[in-house]
Amino acid sequence: MFERLFRKKRFKYKCDECQEYHVGSPSFSMKHPTSFFDVPETERNDRVQYNDDLCMITPRENDTTEDPIYYIRCILEIPIKGASEPFMWGVWITQSKENFERYIETFEANQSNEKSSGWLLVDLPFYNNARTGEPLTHLECEVHWGPKGQRPKVSLWENSHQLAVD
């Protein structure tokens, strides 16, 4: 009886894309970092290098005030009350040039003992508190790189932003 009462439920949802029901928590992923869209389409071929896991955005050729921005794609897990699996956000976290290069160098290896810090630009549905025209919130986080073949996981530093609270 106690097992039935206290067992966590498996989440079930209907996929909008395939119209099928899936068991397990849903996830949502950002295909590109938000700043990708700040680069005009006509300049993206020259200024943006990316794949499914990495992104580097360089400043305009004559811009000496900006540095390149380095991103790695990570997983941010949000627990769902009463569910056995978390909701997962696929997010892009900024990295220093040194950490970005180290991540690339060790990409094909087990990175379980590796970690770095970075920033999450909060442009996620339900969590973006910025008004139109205001800058987006940046949340500091720790990136746990993880086993070979798995995306790194992110833990946000403690703060009062709702995403960190969740």
Labelled PLM ranges:
Residues 8-13, 48, 52-59, 91, ...:
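Hydrophobic transmembrane signal anchors and adjacent membrane-proximal interface regions, especially
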Residues 62-63, 68, 81-84, 95, ...:
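Alpha-helical protein-protein interaction elements
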Residues 105-166:
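C-terminal, charged low-complexity interaction regions
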Residues 80-119:
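Elongated scaffolding segments in large macromolecular assemblies
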Residues 39, 64, 82, 88-90, ...:
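Charged, low-complexity intrinsically disordered segments
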Residues 45, 51, 62, 99, ...:
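Detector for Asparagine
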Residues 33, 96, 163-166:
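Helix N-terminus capping/helix-initiation residues
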Residues 2-83:
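Basic, glycine-/proline-tolerant helical and adjacent loop/strand elements
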